[in-house]
């Protein structure tokens, strides 16, 4: 809905706009990359559900959600297999409660996980963060972000171009080690450095801010 409104306003002035979509996926801008990297490097065996759930469950109670982020908080509270938890936020049991047909719930869950696991196998096995970026770029980006923007903009006869997703540029970014994308807990490190001569510090160092709005509030208005 927010994208639809922005597109509607933009169309009053222009017919074509540029979008920054792809920046988070290409330069490790999402918070969950930081959290998942830390969890991945932790010596605890995530494939031991009982031990994992006990330890992370206790830790989850002691640390406020806003300090660890929703993704890490989810893993803490669930204590699930690490890979499974990342590629599929809902367990099979949880999906059974979402679908009326149990057969559909089980097969949908298995199919989704297997598909994403196959994508991860094609990624950089020696660079965990790059592998997670690759997964997002292959799934979340085309199936969510780009689809949402395309539908919202075209409903307002507005063309949105995505320069960061030029295939040559995207391929180049995956040759950059994740250590240059995430450095000292700063996301998009090398991207921000390269833009320092063109953008104000207030823009480069602005806290990350999601683009969303309460649907209930929008409907009320």
Q: Which stretches of residues belong to each language-model region?
A:
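PAPS-dependent sulfotransferase catalytic core
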Residues: 199-221
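A general structural signal for short secondary-structure junctions and capping/turn motifs
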Residues: 7-10, 131, 203
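Globin-like tetrapyrrole-binding proteins
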Residues: 141
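A short, charged helix-loop
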Residues: 108-121
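ATP-dependent adenylate-handling active sites, centered on carboxylate activation for C-N bond formation
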Residues: 1-111, 151-198
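Structural motif
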Residues: 123-136, 186
């Amino acid at each position: 809905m927010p994208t639809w409104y922005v597109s509607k306003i933009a169309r009053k002035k222009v017919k074509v706009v540029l979008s920054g979509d792809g920046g988070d996926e290409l330069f490790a801008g999402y918070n969950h990359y930081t959290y998942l990297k830390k969890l991945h490097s932790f010596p605890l065996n995530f494939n031991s559900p009982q031990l994992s759930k006990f330890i992370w469950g206790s830790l989850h109670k002691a640390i406020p959600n806003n300090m660890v982020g929703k993704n890490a908080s989810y893993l803490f509270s669930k204590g699930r297999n690490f890979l499974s938890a990342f590629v599929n936020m809902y367990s099979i049991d949880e999906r059974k409660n979402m679908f009326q047909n149990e057969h559909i719930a089980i097969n949908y869950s298995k199919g989704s996980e297997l598909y994403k696991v196959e994508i991860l196998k094609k990624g950089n096995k020696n660079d965990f963060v790059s592998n997670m970026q690759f997964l997002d770029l292959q799934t979340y980006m085309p199936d969510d972000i780009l689809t949402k923007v395309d539908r919202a903009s075209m409903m307002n006869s507005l063309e949105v171009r995505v320069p960061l997703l030029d295939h040559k540029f995207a391929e180049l970014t995956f040759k950059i080690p994740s250590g240059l994308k995430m450095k000292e807990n700063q996301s998009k490190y090398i991207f921000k450095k390269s833009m320092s001569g063109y953008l104000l510090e207030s823009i480069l160092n602005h806290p990350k801010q999601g683009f969303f709005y309460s649907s209930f509030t929008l409907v009320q208005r």
